[in-house]
Amino acid sequence: MKVLLTVIATATMLLAGQANAADGQALAQKSGCLACHSVDKKVLGPSYKDVAAKYKGDKGAEARLVEKVKKGGSGVWGPMPMPANSPQVKDEDIKTIVQWVLSL
């Protein structure tokens, strides 16, 4: 019985992770993020894989990136400023997108 519960719990977590990744990518598309970003190459802004690599292992990265996406800013990845995305993109959607980016 314990083995069955462990298998079910593990499968649930794996499927939830896949759903979050799909949700993050879909939200990035819907929110217009892909006008300036791409998963694997620089467009106007950095690629999402470059962002994930830069912040790999950084415990505070998610919170900082959520704020950066909300408020916008410049100077981190070059001279092109990132526009603020709040309130037009909901906070929970921004968090989902950032989690997806960091998972790449």
Labelled PLM ranges:
Residues 44-53, 68-98:
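Axial heme c-ligation environment in periplasmic c-type cytochrome domains
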Residues 6-15:
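Bacterial N-terminal signal peptides
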Residues 25-27:
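Immediate flanking context of iron-sulfur cluster ligation sites
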Residues 15-21:
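Sec/Tat signal peptide C-region and signal peptidase I cleavage site
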Residues 32-39, 97:
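The canonical Cys-X-X-Cys-His
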Residues 100-104:
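Short hydrophobic/aromatic patches at helix-to-coil boundaries
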